[in-house]
Every structure is written in structure tokens, then in C-alpha cells.
A protein has these predicted regions:
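Boundary regions of SH3-family modules and the immediately adjacent low-complexity/disordered segments
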Residues: 1-30
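Low-complexity, Gly/Ser/Thr/Pro-rich intrinsically disordered linker/tail segments
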Residues: 121-138
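Catalytic cysteine-centered active-site loop
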Residues: 31-78
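...with weaker cross-activation on analogous glycine-rich loops/strands in unrelated enzymes
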Residues: 58-116
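Short alpha-helical interface patches
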Residues: 8-10, 114-124
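Intrinsically disordered, low-complexity proline/serine/threonine-rich regions
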Residues: 16-22, 26, 35-37, 54-55, ...
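Terminal peptide-recognition signature
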Residues: 24, 47, 81
Length: 138
């Protein structure tokens, strides 16, 4: 069977993708795989790291190193582009009400309500938010 690639899907090898929402949504429903960093399987820290990789910006691979690397945000309110860190977990706010992460218990990358996600992780994993940074501060 013949398969075709649309010309609009082909990117120059030097292409940068500044639209982080587009990058993260590309992985929506991708299987959660601890240590994975492809569309076959990905974990939470790789999901965040891959945006920076696409833009030729260094960003650590593991959540604990990402926490040390990122600057703390001053505001307590979650906003578009906020990277939320827990011990061993990370995700990003697509806007103030929607949050995307590679979520182990659901076994895939998914979008969830921001506030409910923070409460759910606190309740089910007994984890408090360690740090919030913003993608624009990297």
C-alpha cells in the first residue's frame, strides 16, 4: 500500500519549534514508558526535555536535575507555560486551567485540569509541589 507524506509535514533539519503547546500535544496519548523519550513511549521528564531539545537548548533529562536547573517562579498562581515539579514528577500548564504530563497511573500522556491534578498527586502519591518555574525563564 502506498503511503504519502504531506509536503507541509516536512521540516528543514534546522527547523525550531517555538510553540511548546504544539510540541507537547504531538505526544498526547503516547504510552507512558519510564526512561522513554520517543513517540513510542515517554516519561514525564523527557516530555518536558524534548521541547528544549527541539529548540537546541540544553535542559536536564531527570526531574531532580530539572528542579535544580530551573529558577523558581515568584507568583503562586499557575499560568500558561508554568512547569510544575514534584519529587520524581513534572508537567506543564498549557494555560491556567489545563495541564499536560506523562502520567504513570494512567499509562499515557494526557491533559488534565491543573488544580485537580495538583490535588490528585498530593492525595494519591502524598507529594507536594516542590517548585514552579516558567518555560520562558529557561
Amino acid at each position: 500500500e502506498n503511503k504519502w507524506i504531506k509536503k507541509s509535514d516536512i521540516k528543514n533539519i534546522h527547523h525550531y519549534e517555538k510553540n511548546y503547546i504544539k510540541v507537547f500535544k504531538f505526544f498526547l496519548n503516547t504510552k507512558y514508558l519510564w526512561g522513554g523519550k520517543t513517540c513510542v513511549g515517554i516519561d514525564c521528564s523527557a516530555l518536558i526535555q524534548i521541547y528544549f531539545y527541539y529548540n537546541r537548548i540544553f535542559f536536564p533529562r531527570d526531574t531532580k536535575d530539572q528542579i535544580r536547573f530551573c529558577k523558581r517562579k515568584r507568583s503562586k498562581n499557575q499560568l500558561k507555560g508554568d512547569i510544575v515539579f514534584w519529587k520524581g514528577h513534572v508537567g506543564i500548564c498549557l494555560n491556567k486551567s489545563r495541564f499536560i504530563h506523562a502520567y504513570g497511573p494512567k499509562k499515557k500522556v494526557l491533559i488534565m485540569p491543573t488544580v485537580q491534578t495538583i490535588k490528585l498527586i498530593d492525595k494519591t502519591a502524598n507529594l507536594k509541589v516542590k517548585k514552579v518555574s516558567n518555560i520562558s525563564n529557561i
